[in-house]
């Protein structure tokens, strides 16, 4: 029997490239792009219907997301009829992201902010020049 948790876990393996470009990769479920999941047991197996969204109207990832979602869901043991739809509302908001991903993204942005401290590097520094280091463990 395939559960909604199984479906969401499978879809979360599909990484949103914009999250990767931002330096903090997230799957579709973490990003809040899995808009709906329906799982129904039938005599022939589990029918699965999902609705996938994108973050904005101009996003070109809708079709690739849907194609990859179909492949991954079809590969689940016991999957029968798979229906993948694209959400045409384009109403995604940052609040749609899962809370655990929002926290991870927040920590990433804090670290990224610390890494933007300007550092002057002298390529031909003498051995007696002071060494500069930063403690980023805080």
Explain the meaning of each model-derived region.
Residues 1-138:
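Domain-level signature for proteins that mediate thiol-based redox and metal-cofactor handling
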């Amino acid at each position: 029997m395939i559960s909604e948790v199984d479906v969401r876990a499978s879809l979360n393996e599909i990484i949103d490239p914009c999250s990767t470009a931002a330096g903090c990769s997230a799957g579709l479920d973490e990003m809040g792009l899995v808009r709906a999941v329906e799982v129904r047991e039938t005599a022939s197996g589990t029918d699965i219907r999902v609705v996938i969204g994108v973050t904005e109207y101009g996003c070109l990832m809708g079709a690739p997301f849907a194609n990859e979602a179909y492949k991954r869901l079809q590969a689940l043991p016991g999957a029968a009829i798979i229906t993948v739809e694209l959400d045409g509302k384009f109403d995604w908001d940052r609040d749609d992201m899962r809370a655990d991903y929002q926290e991870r993204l927040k920590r990433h942005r804090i670290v990224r902010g610390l890494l933007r401290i300007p550092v002057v590097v002298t390529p031909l520094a003498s051995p007696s020049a002071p060494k500069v280091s930063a403690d980023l463990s805080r």
